[in-house]
């Protein structure tokens, strides 16, 4: 089961918008996650420790996570996951395929 967490042990219910970019040689890439009104704020009032992508292969994580507040209330979370080689890219794609299938999501290629 593929899941996303901001606090280990607390699953995030909001489905993110994910944008991927990759270098031309395929050696590295970045995934940018955007969560509008994430549910973590409803169940946890402490510090967000990172973005954790968990599936049967293990865990991918990043500490590059930013929360946006409007009038003192949490509104959204943005996170970036950097992949430094082809193996990390392929591992991330396997996670996203599982997460997408589980949540009935699809991939849309950007228009140039």
UniProtKB/Swiss-Prot annotation:
GO cellular component, as recorded: cyanelle thylakoid membrane; photosystem II
Family to which the UniProt record says this protein belongs: Belongs to the Psb28 family.
Organism name: Cyanophora paradoxa
Name the UniProt record assigns to this protein: Photosystem II reaction center Psb28 protein
Known partners and oligomeric status: Part of the photosystem II complex.
Locations listed in the record: Plastid, Cyanelle thylakoid membrane
Keywords: Cyanelle, Membrane, Photosynthesis, Photosystem II, Plastid, Thylakoid
Single Gene Ontology BP annotation: photosynthesis
InterPro entries in the record: Psb28_c1_sf, PSII_Psb28_class-1
Family annotation (NCBIfam families): PS_II_psb28 (TIGR03047)
Membrane topology label: Peripheral membrane protein
Tagged with keyword Repeat: no
Alphabetized PANTHER family for the sequence: PHOTOSYSTEM II REACTION CENTER PSB28 PROTEIN, CHLOROPLASTIC, PTHR34963
Record bears the keyword Thylakoid: yes
Source lineage: Eukaryota, Glaucocystophyceae, Cyanophoraceae, Cyanophora
């Amino acid at each position: 089961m593929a899941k996303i967490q901001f606090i280990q042990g607390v699953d995030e219910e909001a489905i993110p918008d994910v944008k991927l970019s990759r270098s031309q040689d395929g050696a590295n890439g970045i995934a940018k996650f955007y969560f509008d009104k994430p549910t973590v704020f409803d169940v946890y009032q402490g510090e967000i420790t990172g973005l954790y992508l968990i599936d049967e292969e293990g865990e991918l994580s990043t500490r590059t996570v930013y929360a946006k507040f409007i009038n003192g209330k949490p509104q959204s979370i943005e996170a970036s996951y950097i992949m430094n080689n082809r193996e990390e890219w392929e591992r991330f794609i396997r996670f996203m395929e599982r997460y997408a299938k589980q949540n009935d999501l699809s991939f849309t290629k950007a228009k140039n």
